[in-house]
Amino acid sequence: MPADQHSSIRRFIRRARARMFRTGAYGFGTITLLAMLVGTVAGYAAIGFYLLISALLKFSFGVDEETLATGASSLDWWHLLFVPTIGGLLVGILLTFHKNKQTSGVASVIEAAAINDNNLNLKDGLVSAVASIVLLGTGASMGREGPAVHLGATLTSAITKKLRLNPASGRILLGCGVAAAVSASFNAPIAGVFFALEIVIGHYALHTFAPIVIAAIAGTLVSRIHIGNFPAFHTTEYFITSFWEFPAFFLLGIVAALVSVVFMYGLNWTDKMRVKIDRIPYWIQPSISGFLIGTIALAYPEILSIGYEATSRALNGEYALGLLLPLIIVKIIAAIISYAGRLGIGVFSPSLFIGAMLGGSFGIAAGSLFPTLASSPGLYAIVGMGAVASAVMGAPISTMLIVFEITHDYNVTIAVMIASAVASIVTSLFYERSFFLMQLANRGIRLEGGKATYLLKSATIGQHMSRDFFTIQETETAQKARE
């Protein structure tokens, strides 16, 4: 090959490399490599979080997460009271030495992406992760997905600050960390992508979509290599019996919305009562909550920790109406107690739990009224699970995808879509668009209209006025003014 051709090829490669790895918001090569890095880091953080919780549950209750409710029902009464109380006491002591006096979650990630230039404090993230591991490992009635997302986002924020990336690139990578954490937690890469776009980023764009997909794949691969490739819930394969059931799915969406509103109102009430609650010393609040949760667990051990065993059994139609209805009430109460006691709270798992119990109850009632038309209560449990989670999270698309991916049952797609859409619409009529927006509103940050709307509403004229100008007398000549 002639020398001039060699020279042309070398120049082309240099230009391509420079263009691919240029410094800026959307350098494709740089963002792609960083998305892979962030996805791997967040994926390992999520599975480490999961494995530590599982190990502590085994130590605390002698059983795995998958059999916690069954195993706890055979324990002595003092054991069920003692373990959550001690877990709360340990976290109370930890938070006493922490500036924020509480754990952080998804709302903090949304705030960072919207108005704080993607800045999350690494110490806050690590303290929240340790506290959540202790709490979930000792039976606190909350979810692990919110703390896992916050941990992944915090580590991503630390990476972006270390590399001194600009805010636009940092926001994309923050979404990458969130997507990877969700994907690794649920073995659900598609849902992880849309969770990050729908909840954290707040919009869909090609330059954002591609890196987030790469990060979600990286997080999923890490999870499948170390934990395995299986759904979170093993369910019977269900089919919709009749198209006459569609009005029932619509009605279930309305009922799910009302239950979701009650759930979120209860959580919001604890925020409004925070001044009175804080009259109790910080360090003892979590242990009081732990004791109360242990007391409820004496009668209903299903509410302990994440509650995946109980949720799975409801999805398989194993619970009677006499147990399903009380579990809805006690899970809401237990989650509110956890939130009030500064135990932090991931709302996704409680939402799945409440929705599964609600849907199962609805399915049993529908079957008793229309025995030849109604499907299995397990099918309604899946539909209810998606409807309540969509309403609470304010993210119907990603929630529906998570439900499909964690159950591997796509036969109920239309039913879940109907109930989720109805639940989201009805909830928005009575309340904030999501639990996370409610948390931010309580902090004085209202993002219903998006980041731009909030910034415009919070800005003052004085912030944009310039006082650096010259004055001249009205009698001065044009020549003097030009000078």
Describe every region a protein language model picked out.
Residues 1-458, 462-483:
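Alpha-helical transmembrane segments and immediately membrane-proximal extracytoplasmic
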